[in-house]
Amino acid sequence: MPRLSRRQLLKTAAISTALSTVPAPLLAASREKLVVPPLIEVRRGRPIVLTMQETNYPLDGSHNVTVWGFNGNYLGPTIKIKSGSFAKLNYHNNLPQSVALSIQGLQASGELFGGAARVLKKGESWAPIVPIEQPAASCWYRSATLANSAYQTYRGLAGMWLIEDEQSLKANLPNKYGVDDIPLILQDMEFNNDGLQLFKQNQPHFVGNRLLVNGIEAPYLDVARGWIRLRLLNASLARAYDLRLDNDQEMLLIAQDLGFLPKAKSVKSLVLSPGERAEILVNMMKLTTYLSLAEVNVACTKNKKYVVLRR
């Protein structure tokens, strides 16, 4: 496949497709539907309210347990903001621990977007105003608390932060959030018999044995006919993922951590290290049943399929 310039990418793309034979109704019956994080689209100075708090959620699929997150949900909402505007943040910490937050990939000074030096104790709030002055990119926010960031991120203090610019807004790319423009937050975890998250504080490279997408293990998602855009985030602590489509179909890699690639790349697999982001396009036009985003080499995991895309 010829390499595409960014200008060509914003106009058109082409990927070969393949078919799978498992009936979609049977497949979906054994899986939960993907939860798409709520969207906060910032317009005309709308404040971004992020309240860190405990909530109840069945992470293991059966036990309703206490987890952490934002605004009453496990994980945080997706923030979408245009370059050239200001992010009016309102952080509130209702958790039993002190928390510092950071926005990874955001090009702004640390005193404005947080970091380990800006700690919020239980009950405290903070309302910085952050100028957004960079090209379109998929960033993410997470805990940056000194000596405790891994644990707090693992508990659920993470979410996606999407920056758009004039070019990305005019692009001929999927942009209907939750329909054909879908965030996928990848995590690995361990649970006890009661469904509570296990975290091995003294293990330098913690790797769980359960794989979750947006807080659900191996979910399915009904998607639109045609092209879909997947915004991938590896929110795991130590696990790197080698991702592919299980029918060996090609994906079009269009963006990574700091924005669009100079030229799009047709790939059959994609490696994501912890904290890395990537955007891929998948052609669902000819697909009659489903395909799965899976990991090529998964060790010590219960289920290698991350999310089933069903049309």
UniProtKB/Swiss-Prot annotation:
Q: Say yes or no: keyword Methyltransferase present.
A: no
Which GO biological-process labels does this protein carry?
A: cell division
Q: What does this protein do?
A: Cell division protein that is required for growth during stress conditions. May be involved in protecting or stabilizing the divisomal assembly under conditions of stress.
Protein name in UniProt: Putative cell division protein FtsP
Native species of this protein?
Haemophilus influenzae (strain ATCC 51907 / DSM 11121 / KW20 / Rd)
Q: Where in the cell is it found?
A: Periplasm
Which Gene Ontology molecular function entries are recorded, alphabetically?
Answer: copper ion binding
Against SUPFAM superfamilies, the record matches this protein to: Cupredoxins
Recorded hits in PROSITE patterns, A to Z, give: TAT (PS51318)
Q: Which coarse location class applies to the principal site listed for this UniProt protein?
A: periplasm
Modification comment = Predicted to be exported by the Tat system. The position of the signal peptide cleavage has not been experimentally proven.
GO CC list = periplasmic space
Q: Tell me its family.
A: Belongs to the FtsP family.
Does Ribosomal protein count among this protein's keywords? no
Q: Which residues form the signal peptide?
A: 1-29
Q: Print the keywords alphabetically.
A: Cell cycle, Cell division, Periplasm, Signal
Its gene is ftsP
Q: What's the short name of a Pfam family annotated to this entry?
A: Cu-oxidase_3
The Plastocyanin-like domain sits at: 228-297
